Amino acid sequence: MHERSEIARLLRLEGDVRIDFLDSTALAGNPLGDPATRPVVVYLPPGYDADASRRYPALYALHGYTGDAATLVSSRPWETNVLQWTDRLVREERMPPSLVVLVDGFTRLGGSQYVDSIHNGAYATYTVRDVVGHVDANYRTVATEGGRAVLGKSSGGFGAMHLVLEHPGVFAAFASHSGDSYFRYAHFPAFATVHRALEAHDFDLAAFVAAFEAKHKRNMTEYTTMEMLAYTAAYSPRGAHAFDLDLPFDRKTGELRDDVFARWLAFDPAERVAGCQAELSRLRLRYLDCGRRDEYNLDIGARVIARRIRDLGLEVRHEEFDDDHRNVGYRYAISLPALAAVLDHE
């Protein structure tokens, strides 16, 4: 019998939390020099240690841009994080006992989008092979597709959609909370601002990043520019060297580069779903939500995805809220029970 962890006591959980450190071969030697050893945070429901024969489904939670595994563990006043929601829902018998696994997808640029990139490293492979493999090998999971779901918010919501489309057979369900989608509205409006910011550094991307990292405080333009560099590294890397990227606009004039933006759109869930009927058909739950005042227009993206999934003759649960992009953890109270309910239990 394990003694309950300090984190579990700090968060006032009835369940427990374990933190492992995983050496990921998928991330080894990445051009940004980001660590290949990553924390894997695992929530265990109450009673996990009491019955050594029982197995549990696992829900994999993906953080958003600028997040890491610690972000999902952190506690803020008057808010409830994903582990606290899980513990409460299990305690109140609104959700069957399940494991929740927090995946760390942070990079030097602020995030990986959970895709395989020659510039960032193979973050999709790291998630579905290294993290899932580690959890199945070390915890009593239902170690099949039917025993796993993936969820996330913002870039994590994008990651959840990307993984079920790119790696069918790993997860049986997904939930996307305000997930990145319909890039024509979500990302394109920022390109002119980013062009001007990089022009001030003569388009020396390494110099911009170094200046960004050296600051104690960053303004919104700098933050947006770093965010777009992270997306560029995920969607349109040019080579396997740090900052060797194809920007989605012409460096001299700022004109949109249709050839590069087409590479971004190849990752856009709103563009992809129409051609992914087989991948979507095997899922037991497809869940999307967003606030109707989302600052990145992701409510439109969610509507487009929902309609295109329905056009395939498939069901999708699509929720909208009178809300924006921030502080949406309350929606875990909807998605977590819905995901756990469709998974296999032993």
Predicted regions: what is each one?
Residues M1-E346:
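Non-catalytic cap/lid and distal C-terminal segments of serine-dependent acyl enzymes
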